[in-house]
Amino acid sequence: MFTQANLFLILLLAIALIAKNQSLIIAVSVLLLIKLIGLDQKLFPAIQSKGINWGVTVITIAVLVPIATGEIGFKQLGEAMKSYYAWIALGAGILVALIAKNGITLLAEDPHITTALVFGTILAVALFKGVAVGPLIGAGIAYLVMQAVQHFTS
């Protein structure tokens, strides 16, 4: 029961409890429960390979609820597009998607980066009440910074 992985998860749970971070508490508790009941070999590969997509899908559903309820329609969209804030948000959405594209390349070429990204995400979630938005954005930002460093040092 006290493997290095379990000890690490228990440590993360303690950090989450101290930081009062509900998302991390739930995530670590679910992982420990899956391990405890012995389904880790079956479930972890699926969670690891598809979990980010599931999470993005759930977030997308939550964001689209106002459209589904009729709270936001074409009229509101048209009115919003008259605001420069909406154009900034549109540009930010495009930029983030393009940055994430480079993250896929970096994670494929250097899987060790994943460990640092995961640890950075855990620290931000646990200690600074950050939100785990996925490693692709982090890897994309890391890729851009690495390219800039390489450009200026070579």
From Swiss-Prot:
UniProt key word Lipid biosynthesis: no
Membrane topology of this protein: Multi-pass membrane protein
Transmembrane helix listed as a keyword: yes
Transmembrane segments: 8-28, 54-74, 87-107, 117-137
Coarse class of the protein's main subcellular location: membrane
Localization terms from the record: Cell membrane
Keyword tags: Cell membrane, Membrane, Transmembrane, Transmembrane helix
Classification via HAMAP family: UPF0756
Family listed: Belongs to the UPF0756 family.
Name of the protein in question: UPF0756 membrane protein BLi03063/BL00400
Organism: Bacillus licheniformis (strain ATCC 14580 / DSM 13 / JCM 2505 / CCUG 7422 / NBRC 12200 / NCIMB 9375 / NCTC 10341 / NRRL NRS-1264 / Gibson 46)
Organism lineage string: Bacteria, Bacillati, Bacillota, Bacilli, Bacillales
